[in-house]
Amino acid sequence: IPVGPYLKPDQLFTERQTGLGLIAAVSAYEITGEKRYLDGIKNRLGWLYQHQQHNPDGLGVDGSWRNSWQVHAGNDPPPATDIRGSSPWMTENIIDGLWHAWLATGDKRIPVMITAFGRYMERYGWIDPKVMKEAGVDWRNPCSGPNGQISWYWSSAHATTQQLVAVQSSEGWYSDSHNVEMTLPVAAARYFETDPEQQKALDRRLKQLSSSYDLDCADVSATPRRFNWNNRGVGVVQWFMQQFEAGAD
């Protein structure tokens, strides 16, 4: 996938490549201090900000890095059936990159992007148990308990519930195996969030996700790469939570 800005709705984009690319750029700058890597970070931040805040699909700002499900899945997108949305757990890679970029640059666009995605997740990213009941299917692994959380495999502010359920039933049976990973975007959004009601919502979500910190969940090998996904970027979550408890902004 070429590295660069998101310029058109049918452009191939994955949150994973974009996030890991940003992390690599930050790491290179931290190790070398070379300006070319700092310039690379600034370029990537500009691309991400433009994508999130001024998406070329013209559907407005919802807080995600909205792209095409069909292109994401390797298919040609018929405009009438394209599902404009994003992968919650792949976007964790972007949030991870943004946090490290914040530590390296203090760029003021970063809190805006992170809190916007946190709000998006609260509105569109998590599957309401009522939806599972109405669909007659529960995609969760019982290891997280009866109130275990699960994000959509493909989330959207614009798709119908029927469209999202179809993707979930086809691809998303292991979505909750990424719950530990998903604590990072929630905690990072909570760290930068200034609205008291949003802070409370994110606190509740973190508490709900804590049930996935379970040995039975850790034993599940739904995908061989799951351990890496879940644990690569979330070490800072415990630090975030200490800041919340201490009353830090």
Predicted regions mapped to residue ranges:
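Glycan-recognition and catalytic cores of secretory/periplasmic carbohydrate-active enzymes
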Residues: 1-249
